[in-house]
Amino acid sequence: MRKSFYTWLMTQRHPKSHDPVAILADLVFEDTTFPKHTDSFERVSRYLEDEASFSFNLSEFDRIWEDYLAH
């Protein structure tokens, strides 16, 4: 079973980094309503588009998701 996207993303946190994956990880870490237990692209993507309390470039999210799948 694959780790949840959130669990993987938290391994990418680097608060002083300007790398998009680190930025997203820090934003998600602060977001208490992020879906933490899913590995569904549809669920996470929909959350980022419609529900997140922050905005993030979804093209960058697609690239980050590909990195997640590769791990």
UniProtKB/Swiss-Prot annotation:
Cystine connections: none
Gene3D superfamilies given in the database record: YozE SAM-like
Superkingdom of this protein's organism: Bacteria
InterPro entries (UniProt xref): UPF0346, YozE_SAM-like, YozE_SAM-like_sf
Stored Pfam families: YozE_SAM_like
HAMAP family from the UniProt entry: UPF0346
Family from the record: Belongs to the UPF0346 family.
Protein name (database record): UPF0346 protein SMU_1621c
Annotated organism of origin: Streptococcus mutans serotype c (strain ATCC 700610 / UA159)
